């Protein structure tokens, strides 16, 4: 597919996403609200995106006001939806849950629009991250040329429906993203960045080429069978633990935005028990089990690329 077809499809899918989000807003707004609880987190100011987070103060909102905040949050996709002092590199987060009473017909209608919304989100992410063929450092320019001010992470995030949950509790998750990669994978990624011929701030084009060339040399010097890992820290994330009494099952969901709980009237579903998200303090985190990690040596800091050392 040529570049212009790709851009046209991206713009078309985004316009469709805006329509479905508006339809979802209207559908949910018309349903009887039986409970709503959202947790506002501090905004991340420009220049502080990469600072380690040690404490987070949580503010709770309930009822109709929480519902309004939650429904608005699903449509907050652009930088102009937030203050000028807020970082454009950090996505907005509003964990919580909105609980609605529904008939079977209303549930099917809501599930259909949520499914369509999530399909459009997934397709947009695929267009931008895969079909564009661009390395990550060039996607920002590509997206903002055609959808100026779009916050891609907010756009990609899926909306999570819950059907007749018994309880919804909240907490925090601290983790790393760990991915095994091959030497060839990394060389291909680096050569793609080198051949793009662009500058990535704060580097000039020449400085960027020099940095990428050094990284390529470091990787090329490794033996072919070297075990490589990308171990990227993920900032602490709000999560929800949802319990279903009938199935005796617990499901854990990432919770960067409100979950939508549907309670079926015909089934006699009761209002789920709702927990609170407490303030986060890194000093008070307790690990139930922390396995011994294999020793690693950092090779390419920018990519969080490590060499796995033999014991």
Swiss-Prot record:
Source superkingdom: Bacteria
| Protein location | Cytoplasm
- Cite the InterPro entries for this sequence: DNA_replication_term_site-bd, Tus_dom1, Tus_sf
GO MF term set:
DNA binding
Q: Which UniProt keywords apply?
A: Cytoplasm, DNA replication, DNA-binding
Which Pfam family name is an example for this entry? Answer: Ter
The name on file for this protein is DNA replication terminus site-binding protein
